[in-house]
Amino acid sequence: MNKEEVLIITFKSIQDVLDLESKTKNGRMIPVPSCVKAGCGMSFMSKDLDEEKWKLFLEEQDVLYEDIVRVNF
């Protein structure tokens, strides 16, 4: 089975994940993978690996996030 690299955005609260999900269709909400630590049990996964673009988007949209990591999923 081939694994695909994805970007995981983590959050401190479920409200922040829902906030991002309502502002973009470029990914989806998933449970935090076991290899990632996060304050909230849910995260946002995207196949768009451009971390800088995501950081800029999150800042522009006033979405609070904890971390952005790459994971083979």
Residue ranges of each PLM-predicted region?
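Positively charged, small/polar-rich N-terminal and surface patches that mediate targeting and assembly
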Residues: 1-73
